């Protein structure tokens, strides 16, 4: 009986896994189907996706409205569906390309970005949930969530190996998920100060990966504009899973100074095209010689690239121009720029957003080097502490900044227009106004900058438009108790951090700051606590790595609220409340209607925490299934001696000597997830190799009736002796 099951499972595995990875394996703001010659472009500020036919020329066919703010897109050419991640709504939106209309959506984690799919699953990177969602491709049922390190952003799926590469936005590191085991199996450490890491390009011939990144030189205490950040393409060795430092491509050397390299794509001639979103150009690099071949000017804020091997063209998504640039990959010339969307934004606000993201104008930056977005990408922070003339300064998020005057940690900016000082000093631009910066001897002691130039007014208008995403209004019992503590006289937190902005707009000496480094003294503006769960490190100098450290080891004198005498439970409750402040909600805002299933289909997925075990180690086994119909569900284990047993219950993992279903008549349309084993192995567990099988069978049919199999999965693991 064991051999019969094993042979049938193995044969079906060989057939099914041969066809995994048929869909687009990389996502970004552009996606191209080689099969149908359809090009899809994400328009974040138009809240839409544009659909083009590009086989003969380039023709806009439709523009599909997307709830929330669309981020990235992937095309499934087999089903003629496109998958779009949407921020704010926190959903995966599904477009039916037969009708160029929305087919439905799936709720995912917070701030989703990257999305890719294979023949069985759709994968979504949830940046502010620190996770990857796995969704059954045919039924659109969320199957499981894989926890990863902080701020996962981009995804790249290698269909050959079944490995999913995950970029981490603030560290530049890459996590590797084995999609057959649904586990993070490795992490490639870039060993640098890499930042703004979104895209990853696979080079199978050289067994390499390339990541456009911005390196931060935040340890330098004598910053100049061109020693602050560096535009870089990092090279990874995929065999050794290490960074190849000697093979880094410094774009300011191999090409010319550029700002914020963000996306990249390879053509058929082993040339790498890099979209530089701040300097509004594309760098072209010969990977064989590591030499720059061209620098091509495109539209405003290019954030996405796609290569068409049939026509040998590169498409560029200029998100703040609302256009597509077309590059001839043979001549390395921009041949045309076509309208993608009409951005429905008032001209002053749109101009302000362009200025914020731009380093190409000499008024804004010297030599294309730094934009406002370099440290405040999408208006947020960079997890860095910089040594400025005033002293060490932790980069704050700008979300909600208009509601929290004065500005700067020293509180010496009394209007948003005083950003003119940063444009001239930090970015080394000539400035958006003529004459003085109106910041001598200090910005709050000089004439106002408002009204001095249209560009500066527009930039301030854009800064004022930056707002937090909708807050998570539901609180746990612990968070509610923490709110009471926060507001009580016991802690005194709310005396300075006054709702709704959670600041009093005043400066205080809270015992931080080294006198020799602080040119403007040790009085610091009270920061807002909104969104504090995503803005580590903390304090003006970034000296507190976490909230736990801030309110314990660094608050012995109770200058950040009276916390020294809190019980462990009270301390946990207070942190729960702080972590809940403006926390991005998971799942779509409002009703999210799941798309209709593509076909009668089902899946089964076994997830084991590792493959080799010894007594005393933790073993965790779970099973997940989804589909469009009901099924009887079996989980069978083959012991090292050949004995076959079945899990007879989904509740207590009882093993039966008979091949009975673990669950009868399960509605897979609702999804099915069970943790079967979660234990520490003791020494009397037999050593040897174990085989696990999960099989979904048509209701009422026998396990060994192969024609009745709807889905299956197989895992092998070994328990070694303690010797």
Task: Walk through the language-model features, giving the residues of each.
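Contiguous segments within soluble domain cores/interaction surfaces
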Residues: 625-670
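Short, compositionally biased P/S/T/A/G/V-rich stretches that sit at domain boundaries
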Residues: 594-619, 716-723
């Amino acid at each position: 009986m064991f051999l019969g099951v094993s042979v049938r499972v193995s044969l079906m595995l060989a057939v099914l896994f041969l066809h995994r990875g048929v869909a687009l394996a990389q996502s970004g703001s552009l996606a191209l189907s080689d099969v149908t010659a359809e090009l899809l472009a994400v328009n974040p500020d138009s809240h839409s996706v544009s659909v083009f036919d590009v086989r003969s020329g380039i023709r806009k066919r439709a523009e599909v409205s997307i709830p929330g703010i669309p981020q990235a897109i992937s095309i499934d050419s087999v089903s003629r569906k496109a998958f779009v991640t949407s921020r704010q709504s926190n959903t995966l939106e599904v477009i039916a390309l037969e009708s160029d209309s929305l087919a439905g959506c799936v709720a995912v984690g917070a701030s989703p970005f990257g999305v890719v799919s294979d023949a069985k699953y759709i994968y979504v990177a949830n940046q502010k949930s620190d996770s990857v969602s796995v969704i059954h491709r045919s039924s659109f049922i969320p199957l499981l969530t894989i926890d990863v390190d902080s701020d996962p952003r981009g995804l790249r799926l290698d269909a050959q190996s079944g490995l999913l590469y995950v970029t981490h936005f603030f560290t530049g590191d890459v996590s590797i998920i084995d999609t057959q085991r649904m586990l993070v199996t490795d992490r490639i450490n870039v060993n640098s100060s890499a930042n703004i890491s979104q895209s990853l390009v696979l080079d199978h011939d050289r067994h390499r990966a390339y990541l456009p990144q911005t390196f931060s030189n935040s340890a330098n205490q004598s910053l100049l504009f061109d020693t602050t950040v560096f535009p870089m393409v990092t090279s990874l060795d995929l065999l050794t899973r290490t960074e190849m430092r000697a093979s880094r491509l410094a774009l300011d050397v191999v090409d010319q100074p550029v700002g914020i390299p963000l996306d990249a794509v390879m053509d058929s001639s082993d040339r790498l095209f890099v979209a530089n979103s701040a300097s509004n150009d594309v760098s072209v690099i010969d990977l064989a010689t590591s030499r720059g071949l061209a620098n091509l000017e495109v539209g405003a804020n290019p954030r996405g690239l796609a290569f068409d091997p049939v026509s040998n063209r590169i498409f560029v998504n200029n998100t703040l121009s609302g256009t597509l640039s077309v590059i001839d990959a043979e001549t390395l010339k921009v041949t045309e720029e076509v309208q993608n969307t009409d951005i429905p934004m008032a001209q002053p606000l749109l101009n302000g957003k362009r200025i914020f993201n731009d380093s190409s104008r000499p008024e804004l930056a010297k030599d294309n080097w730094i934009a406002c977005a370099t440290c405040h990408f999408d208006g947020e922070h960079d997890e860095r502490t910089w040594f400025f003339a005033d002293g060490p300064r932790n980069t704050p998020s700008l979300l909600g900044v208009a509601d929290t005057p004065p500005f700067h940690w020293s509180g010496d900016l009394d209007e948003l227009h005083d950003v003119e000082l940063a444009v001239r000093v930090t970015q080394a631009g000539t400035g958006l106004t003529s004459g003085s910066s109106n910041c001598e001897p200090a910005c709050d002691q000089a004439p106002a900058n408002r009204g001095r130039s249209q560009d500066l007014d527009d930039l301030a208008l854009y800064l004022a438009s930056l707002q937090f995403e909708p807050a998570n209004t539901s609180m746990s019992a612990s968070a509610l108790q923490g709110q009471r503590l926060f507001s009580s006289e016991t802690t005194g937190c709310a005396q300075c951090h006054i709702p709704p902005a959670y600041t009093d707009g005043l400066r205080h000496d809270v015992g931080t700051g080294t006198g020799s480094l602080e040119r403007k003294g040790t009085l610091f503006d009270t920061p807002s606590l909104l969104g504090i769960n995503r803005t580590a490190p903390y304090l003006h100098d970034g000296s507190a790595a976490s909230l736990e450290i801030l309110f314990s080891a660094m608050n012995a004198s109770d200058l950040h609220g009276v916390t020294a005498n809190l019980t462990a439970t009270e301390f946990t409750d207070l942190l729960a409340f702080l972590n809940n402040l403006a926390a991005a909600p998971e799942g779509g805002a409002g009703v999210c209607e799941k798309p209709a299933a593509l076909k009668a289909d089902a899946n089964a997925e076994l997830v084991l925490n590792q493959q080799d075990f010894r007594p005393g180690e933790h073993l965790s086994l779970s099973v997940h299934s989804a589909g469009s119909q009901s099924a009887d569900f079996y989980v069978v284990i083959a012991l090292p001696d050949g004995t076959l047993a079945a899990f007879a219950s989904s509740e207590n993992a009882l093993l039966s000597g008979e091949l009975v279903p673990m669950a009868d008549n399960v509605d897979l349309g609702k999804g099915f997830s069970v943790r079967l084993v979660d234990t520490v192995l003791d020494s009397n567990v037999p050593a040897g190799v174990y085989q696990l099988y999960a099989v979904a069978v048509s209701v009422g049919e026998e396990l060994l009736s192969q024609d009745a199999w709807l889905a299956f999965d197989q895992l092998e693991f070994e328990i070694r002796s303690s010797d």
